[in-house]
Amino acid sequence: MGLEHRYADNFADAIPLEFAPEESEASIGQLSAAVKRAIDLTAAAILLLILWPILLLTAILIRLDSIGPVFFRQTRLGLRGRPFHILKFRTMSVLEDGEHIVQATHNDPRITRVGRILRKISIDELPQLINVLRGEMSLVGPRPHARAHDEYYAQRIANYTLRQQAKPGITGWAQINGFRGETPTVHSMRKRILCDIWYVRNFSLWLDLKILLFTPFELLRQRNAH
């Protein structure tokens, strides 16, 4: 399976789901998992050291632009369904309580002026480097969804929870194939989930590297970013 984006439209419909969770866990292996964790720790620490001026400036702009905290915290489900608190820069003027989740949409009035810029280039996700240091997330893996979305889609998409057999990531296979942003229908979410499951099944350090290399190009394309 190559990484060329021109295959993305048909890719998700072609993924077989006939494999058990234990297969995906075994496919990673202890050595690969240890190397992946070492890479996560090293890269996250280096990126935080390099990017701290941008993080500080972003925090200041958020406080100047709208009333509310700098960070948005929300409970998400991580590896094997373990809950953790994800960190993001706040980009909305209305904070959700975690019980009634409404996805951000194009020209969403809740998004602040600064927040719109942050979301376009995914700077709002940078605090998740702290989640990576804590071991709650990885640089690469399925994006963690709000718990309300997990509950909703788990009842409507077969094998939905198989995506939780990998540690959630800041970027992933679904994202570099354009499956990011709003998922207005179950069908659109299913395509994203199938990409996540494909990643779990086909994990390799080389695949992680390719995803990391393609991520900046996808950010520049800004497909479905809002």
Q: Where are the regions that the model predicts?
A:
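N-terminal hydrophobic signal-anchor/signal peptide
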Residues: 1-49, 161, 199, 220, ...
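Short, glycine-rich, amphipathic interfacial segments at transmembrane boundaries or analogous
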Residues: 4, 8-15, 72-110, 171-192
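C-terminal terminal-structure detector
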Residues: 31, 159-226
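Transmembrane helix and adjacent juxtamembrane "hinge" segments in multi-pass inner-membrane proteins
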Residues: 24-72, 211-214
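A short, structured surface patch at a secondary-structure boundary
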Residues: 105-167, 211-219
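Alpha-helical membrane-protein architecture signal
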Residues: 31, 35, 39, 73, ...
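Membrane-interface alpha-helices
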Residues: 63-80, 224-226
